[in-house]
Curated annotation (Swiss-Prot):
Cellular localisation: Microsome; Endoplasmic reticulum
Gene Ontology terms: biological process: cortisol metabolic process; female pregnancy; glucocorticoid metabolic process; regulation of blood volume by renal aldosterone; response to food; response to glucocorticoid; response to hypoxia; response to insulin
Name of the protein this chain belongs to: 11-beta-hydroxysteroid dehydrogenase type 2
Function: Catalyzes the conversion of biologically active 11beta-hydroxyglucocorticoids (11beta-hydroxysteroid) such as cortisol, to inactive 11-ketoglucocorticoids (11-oxosteroid) such as cortisone, in the presence of NAD(+). Functions as a dehydrogenase (oxidase), thereby decreasing the concentration of active glucocorticoids, thus protecting the nonselective mineralocorticoid receptor from occupation by glucocorticoids. Plays an important role in maintaining glucocorticoids balance during preimplantation and protects the fetus from excessive maternal corticosterone exposure.
Superkingdom, natural source: Eukaryota
Signal peptide: none
Record-annotated active site: Y232
Gene: HSD11B2
Region (Essential for protein stability): 335-339
């Protein structure tokens, strides 16, 4: 009988020894991830036996097994104890659900809301413990930010401030960048970038003292050019770069910075169809006549319909995002980036590794597929469509007025 090659035997003994130690410490996640890791190691073993000399095969297998078991280790969590966390944008969505979870875990939660009598604020006041404090704050108003900073400093003297969750976000328009008013870009930057910047800088003395955490909710739209999200995506790209800068600069102070890049989720603001309809009508009412003539009302109606259709694929369970925020606050070694949601791995692979044309087609198929603006449609008087636009297979003819209505 053929003997088992010694590199395989030695490597599997090392893997088994480490797995046993992790099991004794209850530090190994069982289930399908473990089975998948073992299957991959077995396949790697087969390849190493045929392609590598025994010493190299032993080294590769042992290293792969060590890395796999490290990835399967249960994440070490810090105790909650009396830690205090400030969360912005708790009227609804991720902020509200995160505030509820952290309060149930024993955190002292300072939750900011736009309105103290909003439905989300009333829900938090009803279902959470007396430890949770609601604070009114509009990130576009420096006076509100100053008041929250003073309150936080005064009410965390005994516990210190462990974490800041920059969750509040803002988007007004889903349209081409040329169609989006400059005021929309400014308002997105005010909330998503400057508001987070001012609040973070104001709380850094407390966070440096506690060697705490900064968690910011970003968006994949800040990493890749989502169609019709120019204002929102630009602000999210800016805040992501800012947080990466903070991450490097605050490392000597022991402050860890994480960014959450969630997929498409059905938060209250996203699924409010009436709100998006009002914003579309406001955009049409204020659009310069020249742009309205060039693009056409049907074009904007088409974008709006595509956007609402894409929301049907959004996830209604916000738990993955809440869990990511919680892990960033309590993990002994939090990640720099979290990507909760479905399909993000494929999206980022396509964005980083495939040609630009394929990236553009994928984003249009996934989110919003453009039609031709009115001025580029065949038969329009006085207009000759550019050659590249006429030949672009991603652009479909504009919908007829009957379909748009």
């Amino acid at each position: 009988m053929e003997r088992w090659p010694w590199p395989s035997g030695g490597a599997w003994l090392l893997v088994a020894a480490r797995a046993l130690l992790q099991l004794l410490r209850s530090d190994l996640r069982l289930g399908r991830p473990l089975l998948a890791a073992l299957a991959l190691l077995a396949a790697l073993d087969w390849l190493c036996q045929r392609l590598l000399p025994p010493p190299a095969a032993l080294a590769v297998l042992a290293a792969a097994g060590w890395i796999a078991l490290s990835r399967l280790a249960r994440p070490q969590r810090l105790p909650v104890a009396t830690r205090a966390v400030l969360i912005t944008g708790c009227d609804s969505g991720f902020g509200k659900e995160t505030a509820k979870k952290l309060d149930s875990m024993g955190f002292t939660v300072l939750a900011t809301v736009l309105e103290l009598n909003s439905p989300g604020a009333i829900e938090l006041r009803t279902c959470c413990s007396p430890r949770l404090r609601l604070l009114q704050m509009d990130l576009t108003k420096p006076g509100d930010i100053s008041r929250v900073l003073e309150f936080t400093k005064a009410h965390t003297t005994s516990t210190g401030l462990w974490g800041l969750v920059n969750n509040a976000g803002h988007n007004e328009v889903v349209a081409d960048a040329e169609l989006s008013p400059v005021a929309t870009f400014r308002s997105c930057m005010e909330v998503n970038f400057f508001g987070a910047l001012e609040l973070t800088k104001g709380l850094l003395p407390l966070l440096r003292s506690s060697r705490g955490r900064i968690v910011t909710v970003g968006s994949p739209a800040g990493d890749m050019p989502y169609p019709c999200l120019g204002a929102y995506g630009t602000s999210k790209a800016a805040v992501a770069l800012l947080m990466d800068t903070f991450s490097c600069e605050l490392l000597p102070w022991g402050v860890k910075v994480s960014i959450i890049q969630p997929g498409c989720f059905k938060t209250e603001s996203v699924r409010n169809v009436g709100q998006w309809e009002k914003r579309k009508q406001l955009l049409l009412a204020n659009l310069p006549q020249e742009l309205l003539q060039a693009y056409g009302k049907d074009y904007i109606e088409h974008l709006h319909g595509q956007f609402l259709h894409s929301l049907r694929l959004a996830m209604s369970d916000l738990t993955p995002v809440v869990d990511a925020i919680t892990d960033a606050l309590l993990a002994a070694r939090p990640r720099r980036r979290y990507y909760p949601g479905q399909g993000l791995g494929l999206m980022y692979f396509i964005h980083y590794y495939l040609p630009e044309g394929l990236r553009r087609r994928f984003l249009q198929a996934f989110f919003i597929s453009h039609c031709l603006p009115r001025a580029l449609q065949p038969g329009q008087p006085g207009t000759t469509p550019p050659q590249d636009a006429a030949q672009d297979p991603n652009l479909s003819p504009g919908p007829s007025p009957a379909v748009a209505r």
